[in-house]
Amino acid sequence: MTRKQKRLAVIGSGMGFLALAAALTFYALGQQTSYFYMPSDLLSQPAAAQERIRLGGLVQQGSVERGQGTHVSFVVADGQNGVPVVYDGILPDLFREEQGVVIEGRMGPDGVFVADTVLAKHDETYMPREVADRLKKDGLWQEQ
């Protein structure tokens, strides 16, 4: 091989490696995507079965029911609709009724959202902007 052919082979191999790395990165990021919904959005456009999503809204007054151990169920509402949620784990200290939450998990076949992560709103700084903006738009935002 001539010097020029070797250089072209190295450049071609390097570009192929970079293309493979980029493809694997985009594939991995696509697997981690979780779409954001408000309860009304989720009820009008149901998520695909077992699709990981984030649900945001307010914990509905009187809906929190504690079960055995760390099992808890509650309803996340946006003023128009509510979605029942079940969670098995330790809730954040700031979790309470009529407080903003963002939960991550999957919608069950029975219409109950099965959460694996619960994030409680402290203030707008700790809440995703889309949740805070939507709550303000719907007139449900509560200042601390």
Swiss-Prot record:
SUPFAM superfamilies: Heme chaperone CcmE. It holds the Pfam family CcmE. The chain crosses the membrane at residues 8-28. It is a single-pass type II membrane protein. Residues 1-7 are cytoplasmic. It comes from the Bacteria. GO terms for cellular component: plasma membrane. One of its GO terms (molecular function) is heme binding. Its main location: membrane. One of its GO terms (biological process) is cytochrome complex assembly. Heme binds at H122, Y126. Residues 29-144 are periplasmic. Keywords: Cell inner membrane, Cell membrane, Cytochrome c-type biogenesis, Heme, Iron, Membrane, Metal-binding, Signal-anchor, Transmembrane, Transmembrane helix. It is found in: Cell inner membrane. Heme chaperone required for the biogenesis of c-type cytochromes. Transiently binds heme delivered by CcmC and transfers the heme to apo-cytochromes in a process facilitated by CcmF and CcmH. Belongs to the CcmE/CycJ family. HAMAP family: CcmE (MF_01959). This is Cytochrome c-type biogenesis protein CcmE. It comes from Chelativorans sp. (strain BNC1). The gene is ccmE.
